[in-house]
């Protein structure tokens, strides 16, 4: 029997939950098996920024995980998930991952990704950045994690906030090797 490996999407308490929402919808559209984890603070920000209840996003996932539940399957390297995306990623979460501090199920699952050499994609959403933020990003990158900052391009002429968020969602799917058409690709013929 073939196991279809899941991609974990975690949303933490930074502004920019639209990035997590658009990534979730893109993964669903691509037919990917999705495990979703939303922190308590992210739940409040979803209500504020998106004007929806977090349950509306949870309905799109195949499985939901609680960040405070250390007994969840994704806390083990034997769990057959293939990648994890944290979008948006707070600086606190980044720091915990960079320093091997698995304080909850979310940071433990990220730790599993790094130790098992699975894809870990962090979408930090903070500006400006302190030196320690940059150092933590470098640490995660050196461990094999992918830092994909929420810095959308503008060559595709975004007409909405959703277009800008889809640019980042498309880049996340790109690094995971999932084909997508979430934004117009640069051809060099546009100038």
UniProtKB/Swiss-Prot annotation:
Protein name as annotated: Flavin prenyltransferase UbiX
EC number(s) per entry: 2.5.1.129
Enzyme class, first EC level, given as a word: transferase
Gene: ubiX
Binding site for FMN: 13-15, 39, 90-93, 125
GO molecular function, one term: flavin prenyltransferase activity
Function, as annotated: Flavin prenyltransferase that catalyzes the synthesis of the prenylated FMN cofactor (prenyl-FMN) for 4-hydroxy-3-polyprenylbenzoic acid decarboxylase UbiD. The prenyltransferase is metal-independent and links a dimethylallyl moiety from dimethylallyl monophosphate (DMAP) to the flavin N5 and C6 atoms of FMN.
Binding annotation for dimethylallyl phosphate: 155, 171
Lineage: Archaea, Methanobacteriati, Methanobacteriota, Methanomada group, Methanobacteria
Organism: Methanothermobacter thermautotrophicus (strain ATCC 29096 / DSM 1053 / JCM 10044 / NBRC 100330 / Delta H)
